[in-house]
């Protein structure tokens, strides 16, 4: 049918053409990978969500979690489609209830990430969503927080992986799915 053909054709969509490079942002020497063109194209955005969802067994995930802020844009529709609760990792001082925290280093600085102390239960199996893996610092801090709950990250999914920054090295023993890799 025509709908099946459209679905198959979209599966071969080159999503990298919807990523825009912004030189010297947020600081000089960094080339920022802007996902807003992908988000503003309904077909590209839907294809991104579908590729992530198609990579996971819903029965092996209890919670979809995400990292502030671009990860939220992906995780909300993924959690909805998987019929799983959504948990948010936020920058320090952004959550109103009692929190647990972990510090991390970025490609261009450092920071602290927090999560509500009741957001995850022991033995929860988590799918962690973000827009990008660079050095792995932010996602590594999320893994540290998940460990504090005695839960487990069953997978990490991102749109973009900057593999030349070796972020996977910090995220050992976790299955990582990235749609676009820059070497």
Regions found by a protein language model. Give the residues of each.
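Short glycine-rich phosphate-binding loop at a beta-alpha junction
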Residues: 61-68
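PRPP-dependent phosphoribosyltransferase catalytic core
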Residues: 17-18, 140-183
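Conserved G/P- and acidic residue-centered "switch" motifs that form tight phosphate/ATP-binding loops
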Residues: 131, 136
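Active-site-facing substrate-recognition patch
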Residues: 12-61, 111
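Short Gly/Thr/Asp-enriched flexible loops that form oxyanion-binding sites at enzyme active sites
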Residues: 73-82, 143
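Short, glycine/charge-rich flexible loops or terminal/linker lids adjacent to PRPP-binding catalytic cores
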Residues: 85-126
């Amino acid at each position: 049918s025509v709908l099946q053909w459209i679905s198959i054709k979209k599966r071969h969509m080159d999503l990298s053409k919807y990523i825009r490079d912004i030189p010297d942002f947020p600081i000089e020497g960094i080339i920022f990978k802007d996902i807003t063109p992908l988000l503003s194209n309904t077909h590209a955005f839907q294809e991104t969500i579908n590729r992530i969802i198609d990579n996971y067994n819903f029965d092996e995930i209890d919670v979809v979690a995400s990292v502030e802020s671009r990860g939220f844009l992906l995780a909300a529709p993924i959690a909805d489609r998987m019929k799983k609760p959504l948990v948010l990792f936020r920058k320090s001082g952004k959550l109103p209830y009692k929190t647990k925290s972990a510090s991390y280093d970025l490609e261009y600085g450092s920071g602290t990430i927090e999560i509500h102390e009741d957001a995850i239960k022991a033995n929860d199996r988590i799918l962690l969503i973000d827009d990008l893996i660079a050095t792995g610092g932010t996602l590594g801090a999320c893994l540290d927080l998940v460990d504090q709950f005695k839960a487990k990250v069953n997978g990490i999914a991102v749109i973009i992986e900057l593999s030349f920054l070796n972020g996977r090295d910090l995220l050992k023993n976790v299955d990582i799915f990235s749609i676009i890799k820059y070497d």
